[in-house]
């Protein structure tokens, strides 16, 4: 089981004709000086555990995303990633994607 703590995060909901609706964490990490920003999307949300200052978001794969409540959002980089993924889904008629609340 892997654990991730993104610098910023949002919840996306993907609605596809084949699989229906699924919610996922889209997390991002700042690369720092000389590094590259990174993003990761989990396998799908199985359950959310409110831990006070943060949520433990458990994915279908068993991974846990530790999502701090004061870090909801995204960088310009992650915004581009989201828009590209959303456009690709729509261009090939595989579904839609939108930002939703936890």
Regions found by a protein language model. Give the residues of each.
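Cysteine-centric segments in proteins
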Residues: 1-56, 60-102
């Amino acid at each position: 089981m892997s654990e991730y703590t993104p610098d910023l995060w949002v919840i996306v909901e993907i609605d596809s004709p084949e699989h229906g609706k699924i919610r996922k964490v889209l997390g991002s990490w700042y690369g720092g000086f000389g590094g590259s920003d990174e993003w990761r999307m989990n396998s799908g949300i199985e359950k959310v555990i409110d831990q006070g200052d943060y949520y433990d978001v458990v994915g279908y794969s068993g991974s846990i995303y530790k999502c701090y409540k004061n870090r909801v959002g995204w960088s310009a980089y992650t915004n581009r990633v989201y828009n590209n993924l959303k456009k690709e889904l729509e261009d090939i008629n595989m579904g839609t994607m939108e930002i939703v609340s936890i």
